[in-house]
A protein has these predicted regions:
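Conserved phosphoryl-transfer catalytic core
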Residues: 22-30
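Amphipathic, non-membrane alpha-helical segments in soluble helical-bundle scaffolds
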Residues: 15-18, 22, 48, 144
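Conserved P-loop NTPase nucleotide-binding/switch module
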Residues: 1-18
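C-terminal-of-GTPase-core extension/linker across diverse P-loop GTPases
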Residues: 31-233, 238, 243-244
Length: 244
């Protein structure tokens, strides 16, 4: 059996995705040109230059998600099923010696996020309890398990972060887009909370841990009341006040 060639595999997959998008772009440009010849105009004057940008990017062998798009361009492109416009995470599995920097550098040209791991180490790690895991990672000079890094990479690629709700018998994380305001975070929990949003009681994760509980956070006056324009921070502890 031939030795694995991860760069060739990445190139092959990337090429297939780019060719699929290239066909969509070329077909769309042809239709826009036909509309211009028949009607003397196109429905959206911003579309032809965007498609030309996409064409140049794909012909250069680069995925569309590497382009910086403004809000209007993002909305316009969402009407098409472009594969390379979607965020991509490449996971590189290696032995304990690690992955070469050249391979990581190349993978970064095709992906939003790159995670390198050793599956054998992760398998051994999964058989240990929490305390043993920490000792095992420390011995290997690894700061955190690959599973944690993969979750963080997925959140990063999708533009998400988390806030928490804390109750007497449950603590739960909720994912929202970065830049989300408090009512949107309320809607992630339940649509009624967003519809009847009044205020968000919030504190930081660090304050909660250092204080030891929400009651202690309130005693230390570190619980804040935030309104509709509050931008949710990663790790916020939030309790929604609402009325419907």
């Amino acid at each position: 059996m031939d030795a694995p060639d991860p760069q060739s595999e990445i190139e092959s997959i990337a090429l297939e995705l780019q060719l699929a998008d290239l066909q969509i772009v070329e077909n769309r440009i042809e239709r826009l040109n036909n509309d211009m010849g028949r009607k003397g105009k196109v429905d959206n004057p911003f579309e032809p230059p965007l498609m030309e940008r996409f064409l140049a990017q794909l012909e250069d062998g680069q995925p569309l998600h590497k382009l910086e798009l403004n809000d209007d361009e993002t909305k316009l492109s969402s009407g098409f099923s472009f594969l390379t416009l979607k965020p991509v995470i490449i996971v590189l599995n290696s032995d304990e010696s690690g992955v070469s920097e050249d391979l990581i550098t190349y993978a970064s040209t095709q992906a939003s996020e790159v995670v390198d791991l050793c599956a054998k180490v992760e398998e051994e790690l999964g058989e240990l309890d929490k305390e043993e895991q920490l000792e095992f990672l420390a011995d290997l000079g690894i700061s955190e398990p690959a599973s944690d890094r993969m979750v963080q990479s997925a959140y990063g690629a999708l533009g998400l972060h988390s806030f928490f709700t804390v109750g007497e018998d449950e603590c739960r994380a909720w994912a929202v887009r970065k830049g989300a305001l408090a009512p949107e975070a309320a809607g992630a929990i339940h649509s009624d909370l967003q519809r009847g949003f009044i205020r968000a009681e919030t504190c930081s994760y660090d304050h909660l841990i250092s204080a030891g509980g929400l009651a202690e956070v309130k005693k230390e006056n570190n619980m804040r009341l935030e309104g509709k324009q509050y931008e949710v921070k990663d790790g916020d502890i939030i309790n929604i006040r609402f009325s419907v």
